[in-house]
Amino acid sequence: MNLKGKRITVHDMTLRDGMHPKRHQMTLDQMRAVATGLDAAGVPLIEVTHGDGLGGSSVNYGFPAHTDAEYLGAVIPLLKRAKVSALLLPGIGTVDHLKEAHALGVHTIRVATHCTEADVSEQHIAMARKLDMDTVGFLMMSHMNSPEGLVKQAKLMESYGANCIYITDSAGYMLPDDVKARLGAVRDALQPQTELGFHGHHNLAMGVANSIAAIEAGANRIDGAAAGLGAGAGNTPLEVFVAVCERMGIETGVDVWKIQDVAEDLVVPMMDFPIRLDRDALTLGYAGVYGSFLLFAKRAGDKYGIPARDILVELGRRGMVGGQEDMIEDTALTLAKARAAQAKREAA
């Protein structure tokens, strides 16, 4: 595998996916410090929103410390080189949220749907293109669709106007061969000028390996987070990925030492708990469960006396996807009732 001289765009998730383990409670000062550090390190694209995207503030997804507008307004004026992106999930974020983000100076909008539901993105992608934004179609939980199925969904998003398509391993479930099969098929099907991206999670410790596999399959945009701060066991750790790229001769434009300093000096100290591959995060990857379900499952487990791991396995068995957070407590309650009934039978 010789990728020497290949140039890619690194996209940082610390201030968006990292909102999940922070329970959306990042301060404006934390946002400013990390964003300016990333900018100084040469990261060209930084995502800033509620963990569930524009408009995510709700009972279902969690109330943030500040509004999206406050976060974006705090960060964008400080950046010298980097551009800011925002995530938008149709059904959570609206066209009005999109217009507001554009007015605040957001450069890139990533319209995210489940990997079989690209058709719900048409209105938002079309509006973003009308506003002349860098417009990304973001196919979540991509392990749940075949390469052929992803091709159909990617081509829909491309037809709506997306100039980049992302294959997203939201559960950290995929292995390098899975990544190559899916991204290779999509790359072959898209127009040559349409870019291809990959978003990985580290729930099987495959974030870096999968990202390299994605580049090999034709991806030129890769997501990561400083110190891996993100849902589950975190995103692909950006400082590690940049170092591997440096070793391989892949050109990121990111300073290998400065990105380490951002991770170690700014991001690690603001973690509420270590982002690591514990048994629950590992279960996300093994069972193919949406990464941001982790803290919801832990809370439900504490409430009903059911191990979070058992809840996550059941969510995977049921094929739950992003947007069904309200079903996690229902699943925990169902398991608790079933176990209580079984214990009663055994005692009889």
UniProtKB/Swiss-Prot annotation:
Mn(2+) binds at residues 17, 199, 201. It catalyses: (S)-4-hydroxy-2-oxopentanoate = acetaldehyde + pyruvate. SUPFAM superfamilies: Aldolase, post-HMGL domain-like. Keywords: Aromatic hydrocarbons catabolism, Lyase, Manganese, Metal-binding. It is an enzyme of class 4 (lyase). The record marks 16 as: Transition state stabilizer. GO terms for biological process: catabolic process; L-leucine biosynthetic process. Its EC number is 4.1.3.39. Disulfide bonds: none annotated. It comes from the Bacteria. Residues 8-260 form the Pyruvate carboxyltransferase domain. The active site is at 20 (proton acceptor). Gene3D superfamilies: 1.10.8.60, Aldolase class I. Substrate binds at residues 16-17, 170, 199, 290. One of its GO terms (molecular function) is 2-isopropylmalate synthase activity. Pfam families: DmpG_comm, HMGL-like. Belongs to the 4-hydroxy-2-oxovalerate aldolase family. PANTHER family: 2-ISOPROPYLMALATE SYNTHASE 1, CHLOROPLASTIC-RELATED (PTHR10277:SF9), HOMOCITRATE SYNTHASE-RELATED (PTHR10277). This is 4-hydroxy-2-oxovalerate aldolase 3. It comes from Burkholderia lata (strain ATCC 17760 / DSM 23089 / LMG 22485 / NCIMB 9086 / R18194 / 383).
